[in-house]
């Protein structure tokens, strides 16, 4: 038996053994010959270990206690392609520390103690494509810090103590495609420093204390396609020209303090396909807010304070595929808000206090085909179906809860009010319908007045129109319009405002009232009637004059056109005069 074991084991002894690494392997590290990788993670190393094979391509030195990198520490590794020095205690890197790594493509220095990158640190790293400097103590980026990194495509400098980025800090980054700046102490962006990044395609700016976006911030970034602005608590407005010059395909402005959709800033972003405005205190989406975003496919407005989405709010969104309005204060979402619902594939309206009535009928009719992304919207009212998911509602309830009733104004008696200037005036307009109608008024000057209107005229809860400090120019007919998804109803009221008695007015008030009357706006009908009356009067006077001239000329009868004149020269004494006397002379004249 022993002999047979010896015979069987003989071929194994004859097999050649795998050659060991040329330079061996450091005692505290693990070497993988096939991938030429050396892993020395969590070994409590205070310096780069000796004995690393010269042909190593990947060196993992993360989570150690290395404090400094000197020029000779990595000089024996010319084949190195990826170096990870993350989560050490590196506070200083000597210029030339990476000079003998011509093949290095990835360098990770995340989570160290670097406060400054001196010039020359990245010399001869011509093939480096990724550099991670995040989670350090960097305070400033000096001019030409990255000037030798001509092939760098991705740069991470977030989670630092940055207070200033010099104007030429990014000079030389000709191929950079992605830049992340986050959790820094920057209070402003320099358009000049970003202007060196001509190939930049994605810019992420997160957790910054910047209060405004200026017009020149991104003007010199024609290739930028993706812009992310997240957690800027001081940002209250996106200026109209802040995105000028960009051709973005993706824009995200989240967790800021903007209170309105930045429609003016979005006006020229015709190539935008994805827009995220989630987690901002936006309460209303007005009509036509996205009318110029003809290529938009995804719109996210989740976790905001949305209470109203006005009709035609999504006008112009012809290619919308995904709409996320989850976790807001919406009671409804009408079909009239869309340019067309036929392109919609995914709808998120979960987390809203939805009123299940006829305004949501279009969703219920499509509940079997619409994708709710696994989060089904549910009814909040009426009480009979509270908590029921829209997708699970039986067809029988459609005729009970999803039927509209046209508004009807209860009191139809015409209101005629006469007031004295300076008094407050109110007109009642109570309407009922299903769902509850909204009430708006139209002034004699054709100006709409709603509950959100500013000025002396406003609509109170219940539909009452209040006009404060009535003036003579407020006189006229007011129209109440009650509307809901089922239709509308109208009602009229008349107001006459008399001037305040002269005895109660000071000269200054009388003068101001006269000026106010002169400034009272004239409608188009008044202007046309006044113009027509003036023209007719002028033409009538001209015609009357012509008739008088004609009658006068005919009444004079026939008269001579020719007449003769006889002229006798005065007699003058003297021989010269006597010689010239020839008697009387005659000549004819013709009157024209």
Swiss-Prot record:
Provide the LRRNT domain boundaries. Answer: 25-54
Claim: Transmembrane is one of the keywords in the record: yes
Q: Which residues form the LRRCT domain?
A: 352-406
Endoplasmic reticulum is among the record's keywords: no
Q: Where is the signal peptide?
A: 1-24
Q: Which segments does the entry list as coiled coil?
A: none
Which superkingdom, per the lineage? Eukaryota
Which residue ranges run through the membrane?
A: 532-552
Residue stretches of each LRR repeat: 55-76, 79-100, 103-124, 127-148, 151-172, 175-196, 207-228, 247-268, 271-292, 295-316, 319-340
Residue positions with a glycan: 127, 185, 247, 257, 276, 324, 488, 512
- Topologically, how does it sit relative to the membrane? Single-pass type I membrane protein
Q: Which residues lie on this side of the membrane: Cytoplasmic?
A: 553-592
**Name of the protein this chain belongs to:** Leucine-rich repeat and immunoglobulin-like domain-containing nogo receptor-interacting protein 3
Lineage here is:
Eukaryota, Metazoa, Chordata, Craniata, Vertebrata
């Amino acid at each position: 038996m022993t002999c047979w074991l010896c015979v069987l084991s003989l071929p194994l002894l004859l097999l050649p053994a795998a050659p060991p690494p040329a330079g061996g392997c450091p005692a505290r590290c693990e070497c993988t010959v096939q991938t030429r990788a050396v892993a020395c993670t969590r070994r409590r190393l205070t310096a780069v270990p000796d004995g690393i094979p010269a042909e190593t391509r990947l060196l993992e030195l993360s989570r150690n206690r290395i404090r400094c990198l000197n020029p000779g520490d990595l000089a024996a590794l010319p084949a190195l392609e990826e170096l990870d020095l993350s989560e050490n205690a590196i506070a200083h890197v000597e210029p030339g520390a990476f000079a003998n790594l011509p093949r290095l493509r990835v360098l990770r220095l995340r989570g160290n103690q670097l406060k400054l990158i001196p010039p020359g640190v990245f010399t001869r790293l011509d093939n480096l494509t990724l550099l991670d400097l995040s989670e350090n103590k960097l305070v400033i980026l000096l001019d030409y810090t990255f000037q030798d990194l001509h092939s760098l495509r991705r740069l991470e400098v977030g989670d630092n103590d940055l207070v200033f980025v010099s104007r030429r800090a990014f000079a030389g980054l000709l191929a950079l495609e992605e830049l992340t700046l986050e959790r820094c102490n920057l209070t402003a962006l320099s358009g000049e420093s970003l202007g060196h990044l001509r190939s930049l395609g994605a810019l992420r700016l997160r957790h910054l204390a910047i209060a405004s976006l200026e017009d020149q911030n991104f003007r010199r970034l024609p290739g930028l396609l993706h812009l992310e602005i997240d957690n800027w608590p001081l940002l209250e407005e996106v200026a109209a020209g802040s995105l000028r010059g960009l051709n973005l395909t993706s824009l995200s402005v989240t967790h800021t303090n903007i209170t309105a959709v930045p429609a003016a800033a979005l006006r020229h972003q015709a190539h935008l396909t994805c827009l995220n405005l989630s987690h901002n205190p936006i309460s209303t989406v007005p009509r036509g807010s996205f009318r110029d975003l003809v290529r938009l496919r995804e719109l996210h407005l989740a976790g905001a304070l949305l209470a109203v989405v006005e009709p035609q709010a999504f006008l112009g969104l012809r290619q919308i595929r995904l709409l996320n309005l989850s976790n807001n204060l919406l009671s409804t979402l009408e079909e009239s808000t869309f340019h067309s619902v036929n392109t919609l594939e995914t709808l998120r309206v979960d987390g809203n206090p939805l009123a299940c009535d006829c305004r949501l009928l279009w969703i219920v009719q499509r509940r079997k085909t619409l994708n709710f992304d696994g989060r089904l919207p549910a009814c909040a009212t009426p009480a009979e179906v509270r908590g029921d998911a829209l997708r699970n509602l039986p067809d029988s309830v459609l005729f009970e809860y999803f039927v509209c009733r046209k508004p009807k104004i209860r009191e139809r008696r015409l209101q005629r009010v006469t007031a004295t200037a300076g008094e407050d005036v109110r007109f009642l307009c109570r309407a009922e319908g299903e769902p509850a109608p909204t009430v708006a008024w139209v002034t004699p000057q054709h100006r709409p007045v709603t509950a959100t209107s500013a000025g002396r005229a406003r609509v109170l809860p219940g539909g009452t129109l209040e006009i404060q400090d009535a003036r003579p120019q407020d006189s006229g007919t007011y129209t109440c319009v009650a509307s809901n998804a089922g239709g509308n109803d109208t009602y009229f009221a008349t107001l006459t405002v008399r001037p305040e008695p002269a005895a109660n007015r000071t000269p200054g008030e009388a003068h101001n009232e006269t000026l106010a009357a002169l400034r009272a706006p004239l409608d188009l009908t008044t202007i046309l009637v006044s113009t027509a009356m003036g023209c007719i009067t002028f033409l009538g006077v001209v015609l009357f004059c012509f008739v008088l001239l004609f009658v006068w000329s005919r009444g004079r009868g026939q008269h001579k056109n020719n007449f003769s004149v006889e002229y006798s020269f005065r007699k003058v004494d003297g021989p010269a005069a006597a010689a010239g006397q020839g008697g009387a002379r005659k000549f004819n004249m013709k009157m024209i």
